[in-house]
Swiss-Prot record:
UniProt protein name: Protein maelstrom homolog
Keyword Nucleus: yes
Subcellular location field: Cytoplasm; Nucleus
Alphabetic keyword roster: Cytoplasm, Developmental protein, Differentiation, DNA-binding, Meiosis, Nucleus, RNA-mediated gene silencing
Lineage, uppermost ranks: Eukaryota, Metazoa, Ecdysozoa, Arthropoda, Hexapoda
Function according to Swiss-Prot or TrEMBL: Plays a central role during gametogenesis by repressing transposable elements and preventing their mobilization, which is essential for the germline integrity. Probably acts via the piRNA metabolic process, which mediates the repression of transposable elements during meiosis by forming complexes composed of piRNAs and Piwi proteins and governs the repression of transposons.
UniProt organism field: Culex quinquefasciatus
Domain of life per record: Eukaryota
Molecular function in Gene Ontology: sequence-specific DNA binding
Gene: mael
Annotated region of DNA binding: 9-75
Biased composition (Basic and acidic residues): 379-388, 451-464
Biased composition range(s): Polar residues: 360-370, 393-421, 439-449
Length: 512
């Protein structure tokens, strides 16, 4: 078995490069790989005096003399040829960086809460769109959006910039076109929209942060947790393309900020905790209930009807979700367009609606006695009505008949029982409440079902004579189903010869 080649010993520059990398990352700078670290650390190494290089020379000698302790020879490697010690060191550093970020967010919110200024805490949300990712891991920018936000004022200010990178990395045109068509739908270079001068873009960003004095201090900006590498790469690319390399951006996770802010507002206004973990904050942001809100995207995406993928719309929607969850805990009334969309209903809208309804109800008058009497009168069951006070007869069968007003006489029952007498009070004003007319030229007989409940009750109240009953028993009825026996003509109850008439039918028989 051939012997495994030993890796080359680490020189003084390697240890200086690792130290330089740690210092830059602690300041918020992110490197894409060791090649970039080597390129950045080289000029600084050349400027070091011999006595400044001595500590690194000693570390290189120690690494060569005792490689196992120094992480040199005899060490295990990953499949990519990376030492396990380096992998573990990077993982430990990431955990340390995450702890520092968490500590920074918690201290920021706790300080504002202790000073009773949680509503005045101003933060910045940022989101970006990109065309493609190069082979070195660099993101080619397409759009950048930043908003200024606080619980009291909601969305205070916004900045939206479309970025034109002019050129794409070699071989990335198809990737850029595919990604653009499936997300933000912005034209790809060389037809891209927006600003191509990166220095001008950076000055707009610094002006938005109110940082024009050359200071390195820039407020922390929050973005979606998984988008931190993308946002960091885009901002770093803008910085590298300009001479304003003194600025250091600090990009923090939005979900962690939302979770800690919600805990602080609950401590202020609630006794019961409703946020058990950070996963609930993530779920609320991922649900994105304001995704299709109109009027919060940039003009280009409004014309494309693709508001969901707009970077400006995205950061505004984050602000709406946080406001909807936290403002009521601290008693902050939400305003349309700042805390919620313009078409949302706020508490003040509900209060105004209730006040208007109460005012309108107070103006209503009670029903007059005359109207009450009209409402209490029974409606006639007949389909022909007459206005007693006029000469007009309103009929649903014969239309309108004009004549002299006459006295309404209730119809008396015939010898065979007759109909019930009309004993109700007549309405002298409304023709639609008139009683049954005793004399009507256009009146036609009404057919009734002899087997109905109404007819049975009539027979009980007005029993038939023995002769008519015997004749009814002799009347044969042919057919199947339900038969209808109408024993009524223009003079009242039917005669014997009418009752004996036989009608043969199929289905439901009718005997007239």
């Amino acid at each position: 078995m051939p012997k495994k080649n030993k890796p080359a010993a680490k020189g003084p520059f390697y240890f200086f490069m690792m130290e330089f990398k740690e210092q830059e990352e602690a300041a918020g700078y992110r490197f894409s790989g060791l090649a970039e670290v080597t390129e950045k650390a080289g000029p600084h190494w050349e400027k070091l005096a011999p006595h400044e290089r001595e500590p690194y020379n000693q570390r290189a000698k120690q690494n060569k003399a005792n490689p196992k302790e120094a992480g040199g020879y005899g060490e295990r490697y990953t499949a990519q040829g990376k030492p396990f010690s380096q992998v573990q060191a990077e993982a430990a550093k990431r955990r340390q960086l995450e702890e520092q970020i968490q500590k920074r967010i918690v201290e920021m919110i706790q300080t504002a809460s202790a000073n009773n200024a949680l509503g005045e805490l101003e933060v910045y949300f940022v989101s970006c769109n990109y065309f493609c990712v190069s082979l070195s891991g660099e993101y080619v920018p397409a759009e950048l959006a930043i908003i200024k936000y606080s619980l009291n004022d909601g969305v205070m200010d916004s900045l939206n910039v479309l970025i034109n990178p002019t050129d794409l990395p070699l071989g990335m045109a198809l990737d850029a076109k595919t990604h653009s068509s499936s997300t933000h739908q912005l034209p790809v270079p060389p037809d891209a929209l927006g600003e191509a001068n990166y220095e001008k873009i950076l000055r707009q960003i610094l002006k938005f942060f109110k940082n024009t004095s050359g200071s390195k201090v820039v407020p922390p900006i929050f973005t979606w947790n998984k988008d931190i590498p993308m946002v960091d790469s885009i901002l770093r690319g803008i910085l590298e393309a300009t001479d304003l390399d003194y600025v250091k951006f600090s990009i923090l996770p939005l979900i962690d900020f939302f979770y800690n802010l919600k805990l602080a507002t609950e401590d202020y206004g609630l006794d019961i905790k409703t946020f058990p973990s950070i996963h609930l904050a993530k779920a609320l942001l991922e649900k994105d209930v304001y995704a299709y809100t109109a009027g919060i995207a940039c003009d280009v995406h409004e014309q494309l009807n693709n508001q969901v993928a707009c970077a400006l719309s995205r950061v505004v929607r984050w602000a709406y979700v946080i406001s909807d969850s936290c403002c009521l805990d601290v008693g902050i009334e939400m305003e349309k367009g700042r805390h919620l969309p313009h078409n949302m209903t706020t508490l003040s809208d509900i209060t105004g609606t209730v006040s208007a309804l109460s005012s309108r109800m107070s103006k209503l008058t009670t029903t007059s006695d005359n109207n009450r009497s009209k409402m209490s009168r029974p409606r006639s069951t007949d389909r022909t009505d007459r206005d007693v006070t006029t000469t007009t007869i309103y009929s649903s069968r014969a239309g309108t008949v004009t004549g002299k007003p006459s006295t309404i006489v209730p119809q008396q029952p015939a010898s065979s029982g007759g109909t019930r007498a009309a004993n109700d009070t007549f309405n002298t004003t409304n023709p639609f409440y008139a009683m049954q007319m005793a004399q009507s030229a256009n009146r036609s007989p009404t057919k009734k079902n002899p087997w109905s409940r109404e007819n049975k009750l009539t027979e009980v109240r007005d029993p038939q004579s023995d002769t008519e009953t015997s004749m009814l028993m002799l009347a044969p009825v042919a057919g199947r189903g339900r038969g209808t026996l109408a024993r009524m003509n223009a003079a009242g109850r039917g005669r014997a010869q009418d009752l004996c008439t036989t009608v043969k039918t199929v289905g439901r028989g009718h005997l007239n």
